Amino acid sequence: MPQRGHPSQERLWALPSLPMAHGPGSEVEGLLDLSFLTEEEQEAISDVLKRDAHLRQLEEGRVSKLRASLEDPWQLKILTGDWFQEARSQRHHHAHFGSDLVRASIRRKKSPKGDQALGSDGEAEAAGEDTIEGEPESRVSIEVAAPERSTETQGPDLSSPYVPSKASEGQEEEPQDHECELEAPGEGGVQVAEADPELDPEQKAEQESQPTPAQSKATSKILENGEEAPGLGPSLDRMLSSSSSVSSLNSSTLSGSLMSLSGEEAGTVQVRGSVLFSLHYEPGTSELRVQVIQCQGLAAARRRRSDPYVKSYLLPDKQSKRKTSVKKRNLNPIFNETLRHSVQQADLPGRVLSLSVWHRESLGRNIFLGEVEVPLDTWNWDSEATWLPLQPRVPPSPDELPSRGLLSLSLKYVPAGSEGGGQPQSGELHFWVKEAQSLVPLRPGSLDTYIQCSVLPDDSRASRQRTRVVRRSLSPVFNHTMVYDGFGPADLRQACAELSLWDHGALASRQLGGTRLSLGTGSSYGLQVPWMDSTPEEKQLWQTLLERPCEWVDGLLPLRTNLVPRA
């Protein structure tokens, strides 16, 4: 952004006290001159405006609930903030907000033809000076109703539909997180879209089909705290979609980093080049420090140039994204930046460092330039900086997906009448769930976990058993025994015992992984079923159980993340 001393920027700092006339002849005079802003600065302002509108919507929902639940006028006046509005109206005679003025000024900063011309380097260039006369769409009047604290920007009807965009989260600035990255088809390449999981895995696909203005009015939005608030309404729709300057900054792309989420072409870039980096673990702060030094011989993404940056993940944690800055027009960029990942030293052997290089597109989807994956269990920590060649991205097969840790358990089958006196009356299957080891959380921090057991094909809720919840532990000790009866030796050959690990949440639980114990024949009682998919290690444990009745059989099995859905 420009320095504080810039005269136009000084006007931005004085927004709350800026006089603004409401007469038709003075609408333009009250607006700000934002012609000096660069494209990146426009994007930053757009993010702030969207965040401001979102926070106002949350505040309106809070106030409406207070008005419906409180009867004391004095307490209601304090909690809703009406006292502040009265004090503000006595000091400031205007009713508009500074954000409304900036939004209206961005509307005015619009090319005469309403679009942008592409320069030789593929980026947008200014299409001309701002014009006021002869452009009715650039004139705007701002009316604010202070008691309701709602804003409305009045303007002409727009032909382009409103495209909602999620307010940016996190503190990373370059590159912008609302953009999407796609791998260009190249050598062994497939398309890969980058989506921001900030969204935490509990956050779901960030954007789906884009609604029209009429749909936006009728559709309620889900608040961050899980509650529903009224739809954004037409005034907010117009504020965010009232000009090409703002709507062009909205991103309707889906973000997500490790899977292909779009079928659009992103160019034809063949992966080549290499990356120089070094790794160091700091025990005092429990940090893995990845020093990204430089890249060399990168592919040109646009007209013999690339704007590269490096992104890192500490897999399988998809929330551990870190990024370097963007180096403009450089196929041999020098970064010399350190990316820090918080991780316990004992967890390093189960992690894989992913370093990927991307070309940043200002107006479109970022382009994949290559990646390297470094298994930390085999890394030489005494080595100096290392050059590794960039590789094309290949989607992993289900068998190659990592596990979430290990499950220690013991099994025992007690045939009917084997204990004397006709006991037990039917065959019993015993599970002793001891502990889970080296669990990998979905996001940094500990887990609240439990183990759930089902003996398929009986998947009824009544037949499920589970352990207690062990809180805040990545190596939880359960020491829990479960018993199922009614099984004969022939039944065990058709059955499959599924033990799954779950992350317990206040509203819902999430399955992290599991193991399936069976003979892995693919069929049960003559029917083909997908859940008979046991690995060789799981098959061996189940076969040993059948061969050694009345004995405890111990096993230490990986908690697989690639369990095939039952149905």
Curated annotation (Swiss-Prot):
Compartments reported by the entry: Endomembrane system; Cell membrane
Assembly behavior: Monomer. Binds NCF2 and NRXN1. Binds RAB27A that has been activated by GTP-binding via its N-terminus.
Job of this protein: Binds phosphatidylinositol 3,4,5-trisphosphate. May play a role in vesicle trafficking. Acts as a RAB27A effector protein and may play a role in cytotoxic granule exocytosis in lymphocytes.
Domain spans labelled RabBD: 31-87
Record InterPro entries: C2_dom, C2_domain_sf, Rab_BD, SYTL1-5_C2B
Modified residues (Phosphoserine): S120, S220
SUPFAM superfamilies documented for this protein: C2 domain (Calcium/lipid-binding domain, CaLB) (SSF49562)
A molecular function GO annotation: small GTPase binding
C2 domain location: 271-390, 403-532
Biased composition regions of type Polar residues, renumbered to the chain: 208-219
Key words, A-Z: Cell membrane, Exocytosis, Membrane, Phosphoprotein, Repeat
Full protein name: Synaptotagmin-like protein 1
